[in-house]
Each structure stands twice: as C-alpha cells, then as structure tokens.
Design a protein with these regions (language model features):
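C-terminal cap of thioredoxin/glutaredoxin-like
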Residues: 1, 13-17, 87-164
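Structural alpha/beta surface segment adjacent to cysteine/selenocysteine redox centers
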Residues: 1-91, 124-127, 160
Length: 164
C-alpha cells in the first residue's frame, strides 16, 4: 500500500472486511509500496506508520494508517499543514513517545524495511497500488490481486487459495 495513493485511501479496510468471514483461516499482513511519483511524502508516511507500529503494536499501526488515509490530501501532497499533525496522529494511535518516533522515522533500518517490502511486492507480481497478494501459507500458492477490487472478489480469491 502507498499511503499517498488515492485509490488505496478508498480501499482502506476492504481487505479486513474480506477476511472477516474466514474466522482465523485468513489474515492481513500489511506491506509498504510507496510509489516514486508520490515522492518523499509517501515514503515518510510509511516510515512513520512503521514506527508507530513499533511503539503501539499492530492495532496502533492500523489506526495510524487509517487516520493518515482520512487526513491526507493524497497524490504526494500529504497532510494539510504538512507534517505538523504526525505527532498527534501517532499519539491517537497509541505511540506517545514522539521523540522516539522521530528518531525511528530517520533510522536507515526502517528505510531498508520499506525497500524490502517494495522488492517483495515486485517479486510477487505487484506493479502498482492498491495491490494484494493472497497466499496459502501451507502450500505456498500466491495469487496477486491488482486494484481496488470489491470485498466479494477478494473473498473469492481467498476461497480459491484455501482450496474451497
């Protein structure tokens, strides 16, 4: 996902809706895929999201991502008023140590993690955003889904991947 992608913004929460009916047989693993044409803003948003997750766990990570999507003007333009809101968004997601958040967002290891997510996505057939990969962890079968598809289409791919 690219946090500056307007289509990803509309797609926020859809994969989670799709897995709900599978009761523990499917899960969502978020991977960053900031597109070059959304500039440094998309990368920086990914860094902050990752760092919020390190402080506030998965729930905080997804809360930050959803709030970023709600507030961003998208297409690399970022938040109204610039990055001044990031600390408040992070705190509302449960990451209260803003100083540690700032240090984390500048950590080369975080940038490498984002680059690794992009490389993994490309290897798996992702060429743009939004993009999903439905994988059966038992068999290793992976099925890429490109674009902001409806919940039912994701459910059908999950059913196919699970052998149902």
């Amino acid at each position: 996902t690219d946090l500056e992608c307007p289509f990803c913004k509309r797609f926020d929460g859809v994969p989670e809706q799709a897995i709900a009916k599978f009761e523990g047989k499917a899960n969502v693993a978020f991977r960053h895929f900031p597109l070059d044409f959304h500039g440094e803003t998309a990368k920086r948003a990914s860094y902050y999201a990752e760092c919020v997750g390190r402080q506030a766990g998965s729930k905080g990570f997804f809360a930050f991502v959803s709030e970023w999507f709600r507030l961003t003007t998208s297409n690399g333009k970022g938040l109204e008023g610039g990055d001044a809101q990031i600390g408040g968004i992070a705190k509302s997601a449960g990451a209260n140590d803003v100083e540690a958040l700032e240090l984390c967002a500048k950590d080369p290891a975080v940038a490498k993690l984002i680059q690794d997510d992009i490389a993994d996505g490309v290897r798996s057939g992702i060429a743009g955003t939004p993009g999903l990969i439905v994988r059966n962890n038992r068999t290793g079968t992976s099925i890429p889904i490109m674009g902001g598809v409806p919940v039912r289409q994701i459910e059908q791919v999950i059913e196919r991947a699970l052998g149902g």
